[in-house]
Swiss-Prot record:
InterPro entries: G_OBG, GTP-bd, GTP-bd_Obg/CgtA, GTP1-OBG_CS, GTP1_OBG_dom, GTP1_OBG_dom_sf, OBG_GTPase, P-loop_NTPase
Source organism phylogeny: Bacteria, Pseudomonadati, Pseudomonadota, Gammaproteobacteria, Enterobacterales
Gene that produces this protein: obg
The protein's name: GTPase Obg
Binding partners and assembly: Monomer.
Domain of life: Bacteria
Length: 390
């Protein structure tokens, strides 16, 4: 299946149903009074994370999602039916952004997590709500409020503990094949990897971590060269980055300059990402003598001003790979994911019915002083009106 990590969709919540103007009319009951019911609330639009999905390709074709409108109220104090909700399923790791405001509405990081992205409209009130000791035959009602409407950007960001970055043909895909069951394509030409891939590294029956491989970066990636830097977002949730450096590039390029290019593109993309823990890993040491490899790695590290630890491995022959993986595992155990902010309770929207009624009644009384016929709402073609006649 094609990997798609971005999609734009339109979500529209249902409008609230209108209230009804109706009067009870039965034999032998000449003054039955008002019996117009309230409308129903509009349906909501929800996002739900599903671990069985791994791409947003479905939303390249289906771009509009609309919840059901609440039904109008009816006579005999019948309340309109609430509109049905719409649930949009997305892969775990999806970020939801409101394109109108640029606000991040939420990150879907757990299976089954739900996020309200469009709230349905409130229902309108029937004329029964306006009955009082001084208004025995109210002919007023209110219409339902419109539901939310939003243009959303969905961004899929892979959930991994370890992220790999480097130039094309640095050996990233070979490494992930060596340490996990993932089988990304490996070949002797640049940009063999076209989409991100994940691999689970199992150290023993109880210890494991997830590593992410993304397409290689080249100079000018921030301006769109090569495959650009759009895949770097998949590393934002990683706890440590493995910067793979081809210790002896077959094209004769300078490993120091190659490393600086990666660091520069990383900083152009995000200072936060550039500040993440990053380990230097010199790959393909099987192509030269051990002593020569150690001396060359030391020279490269000094040229980069690198003061931390670095690793020498050969992903193809798995030389030094196991030690690196155990060090990664130890780092992950010693640096657990920071406790996310306390799970925010869904925002509770309290609709103050007493205040709402009071406000509506005040408006009705003000209108009644000017013209008793002003509140018939003749523009509402959907509302049901039954008027008691003598």
């Amino acid at each position: 299946m094609k990997f798609v990590d971005e999609a734009s969709i339109l979500v529209v919540a249902g409008d609230g149903g209108n209230g009804c103007v109706s009067f009870r009319r039965e034999k032998y009951i000449p003054k039955g009074g008002p019996d117009g019911g309230d409308g129903g609330d509009g349906g909501d639009v929800w996002m739900e994370a599903d671990e069985n999905l791994n791409t947003l390709i479905d939303y390249r074709f289906e771009k509009s999602f609309r919840a059901e409108r609440g039904q109008n109220g009816a006579s005999r104090d019948c309340t309109g039916k609430r509109g049905k909700d719409v649930t949009i399923k997305v892969p775990v790791g999806t970020r939801v952004i409101d394109q109108g405001t640029g606000e991040t509405m939420g990150d879907m990081t757990k299976h089954g997590q739900r996020l309200l992205v469009a709230k349905g409209g409130w229902h309108g009130l029937g004329n029964t709500r306006f009955k009082s000791s001084v208004n025995r035959t109210p002919r007023q009602k209110t219409n339902g409020t419109p539901g939310d409407k939003r243009d959303l950007l969905l961004e899929l960001m892979l959930l991994a503990d370890v992220g790999m970055l480097g130039m094309p043909n640095a050996g990233k895909s070979t490494f992930i094949r060596a340490v996990s069951a993932a089988k990304p394509k490996v070949a002797d030409y640049p940009f063999t990897t076209l989409v991100p891939s994940l691999g689970v590294v199992r150290m023993d029956s109880e210890k494991s971590f997830v590593v992410a491989d993304i397409p290689g970066l080249i100079e000018g990636a921030a301006e769109g060269a090569g495959l650009g830097i759009r895949f770097l977002k998949h590393l934002e949730r990683c706890r440590v980055l493995l910067h793979l450096i081809d210790i002896d590039p077959i094209d004769g390029s300078d490993p120091v300059e190659n490393a600086r290019i990666i660091i520069g593109e990383l900083e152009k993309y995000s200072q936060d990402l550039a500040a993440k823990p990053r380990w230097l890993v010199f790959n393909k040491i099987d192509l030269m003598d051990k002593t020569e490899a150690e001396e060359k790695a030391k020279a490269i590290a000094e040229a980069l001003g690198w003061e931390g630890k670095y690793y020498l491995i050969s992903a193809a022959s798995q030389l030094g790979v196991k030690d690196l993986c155990w060090d990664v595992m130890t780092f992950i155990i010693e640096n657990p994911i920071a406790q996310a902010e306390e799970a925010k309770q869904p925002e509770k929207v309290e609709f103050m019915w007493d205040d709402y009624h009071r406000q509506q009644l005040v408006e009705v009384e003000e209108d009644a002083d000017d013209d008793w016929d002003d509140d018939w709402d003749e523009d509402d073609e959907e509302g049901v009106e039954f008027i008691y006649k003598r």
